[in-house]
Design a protein with these regions (language model features):
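Conserved beta-alpha-beta core of the PfkB/ribokinase-like small-molecule kinase fold
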Residues: 132-204, 227-229
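Active-site-proximal loop->helix
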Residues: 64-76, 95-101, 105, 172
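A glycine-rich helix N-cap at a beta->alpha junction
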Residues: 72-87
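Conserved phosphate-binding/catalytic region of the ribokinase-like
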Residues: 167, 196-307
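Glycine-rich phosphate/adenosyl-contacting loop at the front of the ribokinase-like
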Residues: 1-59, 64-71, 246-248
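Conserved phosphate-binding/catalytic loop of the ribokinase/pfkB sugar-kinase fold
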Residues: 85-87, 95-132, 137
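Short beta-strand scaffold segments in enzyme catalytic cores
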Residues: 45, 92-96, 104, 228-232
């Protein structure tokens, strides 16, 4: 059985700042760093480091940064990758990280959106019963929807992390078996108000998660940052608390969670046990700065949880 991840790869440029600039304000960064990232890449690497058998399909540009991304992808032990060349500049993300470990991200997605059903035909042809397909929200709606339908028809369990939120995300959620998202994303899909992170409570998560689960029929995992996650299915809601840590950089925490959760399910873990491992791995990730290079390994996770 194989976890097949279809998604983006980006050149990540980090600016470490005391605070985010207000509209019209300029701020100086204390430091600039680069890493390899993108939700697709991060989730694929997270799953590999958790022990999954991963095939990753992505696209990069036809420019100099693409060469560095290809080297980074090839260097991931245990991951089989198909890296296509799009006729654009390589996708990149500019990530601001504040002193209180929060982040703000702006990304390009021309290469990710260039991927279509035709270019993904070999990936779909390789899907067999028992595989798992993992997608995100960077690609075109039509492509994402078609790939989810075809993979599901081929016997794969389809997992969707609809971030960044695509247009008509509700229609994509309905095509997935499992949906991983945060409370803001869930509220947006449902058309509910999300005031700020202070409303990021277990009660709000259970309420919104139940609505989304009933609307879509999918198992819903709502991530709540330092509060852990909530699982909504046909059974009673399951709440999983996160270990207490001192956060340095929350970038990639959701991707770590998603990759580790999928890896756990591929190993035969229950929803609860897979999510518990994923919450722990995400907590470890936020103690580190960066994206692809900061994703924890199985050995690091085991040491972290005291196993």
């Amino acid at each position: 059985m194989t976890l097949r991840v279809v998604g983006n790869t980006t050149r990540d440029i980090f600016y470490l700042t005391q605070n985010f600039p207000a509209p019209g304000e300029s701020v100086l960064a204390a430091e600039r760093k680069e890493d390899v990232g993108g939700k697709g890449f991060n989730q694929a690497v997270a799953a590999v480091r958790a022990g999954a058998n991963v095939c990753f399909t992505t696209a990069v540009g036809n420019d100099a940064p693409a060469a560095a991304l290809r080297v980074a992808i090839d260097a991931v032990d245990g991951m089989v990758a198909s890296v296509l060349t799009a006729p654009f500049r390589t996708d990149e993300s500019v990530i601001m990280v504040s002193d209180d470990s929060e982040n703000a991200i702006v990304s390009t997605a021309a290469c990710a959106r260039w991927l279509d059903v035709r270019s993904l035909a070999p990936t779909l042809a390789a899907v067999t019963h028992g595989d798992m397909l993992l997608m995100q929200g960077n690609m075109c709606h039509e492509t994402t929807a078609t790939v989810l339908r075809q993979a599901r028809a081929g016997g794969a369990t389809c997992v969707l992390n609809p971030a960044p939120l695509p247009q008509d995300a509700a229609a994509l959620v309905a095509l997935a078996d499992i949906v991983v998202l945060n409370l803001f994303e869930a509220c947006t899909i449902l058309g509910r108000e999300y005031a700020n992170k202070d409303t990021n409570t277990i009660t709000a998560a259970v309420s919104s998660g139940k609505m989304l689960q009933a609307q879509s029929g999918a198992v819903v995992l709502l991530t709540l940052g330092s509060k852990g996650c909530v699982i909504l299915s046909d059974a009673e809601p399951i709440e999983i608390a996160a270990p207490r840590v001192v956060a340095v950089d929350t970038t990639g925490a959701g991707d770590t969670f998603t990759g580790w959760f999928c890896a756990g399910r591929m190993r035969g873990l229950s929803l609860e046990d897979a999510a518990r491992e994923a919450v722990g791995a995400a907590a470890l990730k936020v103690t580190r700065s960066g994206t692809g290079n900061a994703l924890p390994s199985r050995a690091e996770y085991t040491e972290f949880v005291g196993g």
